[in-house]
A protein has these predicted regions:
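Active-site cofactor/cluster-binding pocket
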Residues: 1-157, 225-230, 282-287
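Ferredoxin-type iron-sulfur electron-transfer modules and their immediate structural context
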Residues: 90, 103-252, 260-287
Length: 287
C-alpha cells in the first residue's frame, strides 16, 4: 500500500494469503498504527499471520533529492521483499534501467535514482504487531461526509472498489443520477498541502486557475462579517468593502504543488505543509 490514506478507504488486505507479505508506506510507528489502522485491517494482518513491513518512502524521497516521487523507492522495496528474483539482481537491473533512462539528464539525476533504489531496499522496517490485533475492535474510523442515501448506498461502495457487489435494484429505474456528488469524495491522498500567506499574496488568483482539481479558490467576504480565518483587504475599486481569502479544501487536494510553483510572488504566498497539521483547521474553514 503506497499511500497511507488508503488503509481507511479500501480493504487493502483483501485476498491476501495466510503468511503473506504486506508492505505499507507510512510515517507511523507501531504505537501510532494502533489508532491509525482500522480494526478490520489489524484483524486481517494478525489472523493471517502476515509478515508486515513499513517504509517511510516520502521521507526517503526528500532525503535523496527525489522530491515527492516515491515510485522507485517502493519498487526497490517490493523486489527486496517479494523474491520474484534475487533482490541483489533486481537492484542491479533497476540501476541499469535508471542509467539508461536518465543518463542524458546528467550524473546527478542518475545518482539520485541510485540512492532511491538503495534506500528502498535498505529502509524497510518489520512491524512486530501484537497478537491482540486478531480480535481488536479498536482502530481508525472514517467519519461519513454526508448522510445522503445516494452517496452512502451507491457512491461510497464504488469509491471503496466494491461497485461490482452492488445489486441492480439499488440503481434508479430511469437511470438518472444526482449531480455534484464529487464534493463528497474527500480522498485525502496528499502528503503535503498548501497554506496561504496573506501578507505575500498579490490576489492574482493564478493558483486557483492552475489547480487541476479546483480545490483552492478565492473568496470575497463582506467587511464586518465574523470569520475564524485570516483575510486581507480585497484589491480593486469594485471590491471596496470586501475582504479577500484564498482557501484550500485539504481533503480534495492531491499535493501536486502546481499552485506554489505558479505563484509569482518573490516570497511565495503558498507553502506546502504536512496534511495532518492543517486538515482539521483548513477543512473547517472550507466548510
Amino acid at each position: 500500500c503506497h499511500n497511507a490514506s488508503y488503509v481507511t478507504r479500501y480493504d487493502v488486505t483483501e485476498g491476501i494469503k495466510e503468511g503473506g507479505t504486506f508492505l505499507l508506506n507510512s510515517e507511523w510507528t507501531l504505537e501510532e498504527m494502533e489508532h491509525e489502522l482500522p480494526a478490520k485491517m489489524k484483524n486481517a494482518i494478525a489472523k493471517n499471520h502476515l509478515k508486515f513491513y513499513n517504509i517511510d518512502a516520502v521521507k526517503l524521497a526528500k532525503e535523496v533529492g527525489m522530491g515527492n516521487r516515491i515510485n522507485t523507492i517502493m519498487q526497490s522495496a517490493f523486489f527486496k521483499l517479494a523474491n520474484v528474483i534475487p533482490a541483489d539482481q533486481a537492484i542491479e537491473y533497476m540501476k541499469a534501467a535508471a542509467k539508461k533512462s536518465y543518463a542524458k539528464k546528467g550524473e546527478d539525476v542518475v545518482a539520485r535514482n541510485y540512492a532511491a533504489i538503495d534506500a528502498g531496499a535498505n529502509a524497510i522496517v518489520e512491524i512486530n504487531y501484537p497478537e491482540s490485533w486478531a480480535t481488536t475492535t479498536e482502530g481508525a474510523v472514517v467519519k461519513p461526509v454526508t448522510d445522503d442515501p445516494y452517496f452512502t448506498q451507491f457512491i461510497s461502495p464504488i469509491l471503496a472498489q466494491n461497485g461490482d457487489k452492488l445489486p441492480v435494484s439499488i440503481m434508479s429505474p430511469d437511470g438518472s443520477v444526482p449531480t455534484g456528488t464529487t464534493k463528497y469524495e474527500k480522498r485525502g491522498i496528499a502528503v503535503e498541502v498548501p497554506v496561504w500567506n496573506a501578507e505575500a499574496c498579490a490576489q492574482c488568483n493564478q493558483c486557483a486557475m492552475v489547480c487541476p482539481h479546483a480545490c483552492i479558490r478565492p473568496f470575497l467576504i463582506k467587511d464586518g462579517t465574523e470569520v475564524p480565518f485570516e483575510t486581507k483587504a480585497a484589491t480593486g475599486k469594485e471590491f471596496a468593502g470586501y475582504k479577500f481569502r484564498m482557501q484550500l479544501s485539504p481533503l480534495d487536494c492531491t499535493g501536486c504543488g502546481n499552485c506554489v510553483d505558479v505563484c509569482p510572488a518573490k516570497t511565495k504566498a503558498l507553502k506546502m505543509v504536512p496534511l495532518h497539521t492543517v486538515q482539521e483547521t483548513e477543512g473547517a474553514n472550507w466548510d
